Structure formats: C-alpha cells, structure tokens
Amino acid sequence: MENEEGKREMTKKQSSRFKSICVFCGSSNGNKASYQDAAIDLAKELVMRKIDLVYGGGSIGLMGLVSQAVHDGGRHVIGVIPKLLMLQELTGETVGEVKEVADMHQRKAVMAKHSDAFITLPGGYGTLEELLEVITWAQLGIHDKPVGLLNVDGYYDALLLFIDKAVEEGFILPTARHIIVSAPTARELFIKLEEYVPQHK
C-alpha cells in the first residue's frame, strides 16, 4: 500500500501542467557558485517534470549550463538567438534546435510563443528587460502565463522591494504584484507555478 502511494506521489511530482518553459538568465556565470548550482537544479527539475526548454540560445554562462543539462537529460531544447549575438553568445557546438531571428524584439516574441511559462534566473540588463517585458505583457492581458523569479541567495530582493514600493506609491496595482511568483529554489518555485492562478485580470 505504501509503495503504491509512493509511486503515485512520484508520478504526481514528475507530471506538470507545462510542456515547455522559457528560461531567462545571464550569459555570465556570476561570481557565486550558488548561481551555477541553481541553474543546474532548475534544469534537473525541468527534466524530472518532463518539461522542454526555450531559452536565449547562448552556449555561455548560466544559459549554457541550463541548456546543456536539459539537453543531456533528454528534453527538447529550443534556443532563440538574434544574428547580431551569434558570435558573442555562441562558443563551440550548440545544443538542441537553434532558431536564428532578426533582432531582440523577435527573439522575445518567438520565445514567448513556444513557452507555457517563464522562469528568470540571476542575470544582468538583458535578463531584467526580458523579465519586465513578460510581466508587462501579463499586466496588459497579452498572455496569462505564469512568471517565475528564482531568487537565488536573495539576488532579486532589491527588485522585489522596488516593485512593492511602486505598489505602495500607486504605480502598480496590488493585483498586478501577484504576476511575479518568486522562490529561493527551483523546487519551491515549481510548486508555486503549478498552482498559479492569475489575479490581475
């Protein structure tokens, strides 16, 4: 009986409402090993839950770590990269399917089209821009896909405080604050994303 319950629980853990998830992250590794560990942990969760990866197409930094680990785990990987970044963000062999696009705007549109949800790891300006755009799209009703923030070692604490301040000052509606789902680990984040229901409509 206990074995049957265990099997059911394992099946439940491995199934997901998402078929593919777009991951935004840095083309650098960051200065802490915890950022790289978080990227690998996220990849393992995607593989365990049988979720395919859509990402920015780079083979360096956290992007490279996530894509390689998901590909090695047997899941489909779609990398979307603008022509102008091909030399900067690609080194050696690429993994999975690479979609070359004209520019950054098309990159985000294609990534969103092929994804059921978004997860953001630590990153810089480009990562923030991608995150804020999909949050804005959700607020405008362009999509109702969950937006997850993997807040590794409090990396995004200041951003979340800023957003809370914007709510407090009347620039963001309280219901729109709930567009962002955050957690410190991939496993905790997935639990929240699986249960996510939009509140901002």
Swiss-Prot record:
Enzyme Commission designation: 3.2.2.n1
| Enzymatic class | hydrolase
Q: Where does substrate bind?
A: 89, 107-108, 124-130, 136
Enumerate the catalysed reactions. N(6)-(dimethylallyl)adenosine 5'-phosphate + H2O = N(6)-dimethylallyladenine + D-ribose 5-phosphate; 9-ribosyl-trans-zeatin 5'-phosphate + H2O = trans-zeatin + D-ribose 5-phosphate
Residue ranges annotated as coiled coil are: none
Molecular function GO labels? cytokinin riboside 5'-monophosphate phosphoribohydrolase activity
**Does Signal appear among the keywords?**
no
**Looking at the keywords, is Hydrolase present?**
yes
List the SUPFAM superfamilies hit by this protein, alphabetically. Answer: MCP/YpsA-like
> What are the alphabetically sorted keywords of the record?
Cytokinin biosynthesis, Hydrolase
The record's listing under Pfam families reads: Lysine_decarbox
Listed name of the protein: Probable cytokinin riboside 5'-monophosphate phosphoribohydrolase LOG6
Protein source organism: Arabidopsis thaliana (Mouse-ear cress)
Q: Which gene encodes it?
A: LOG6
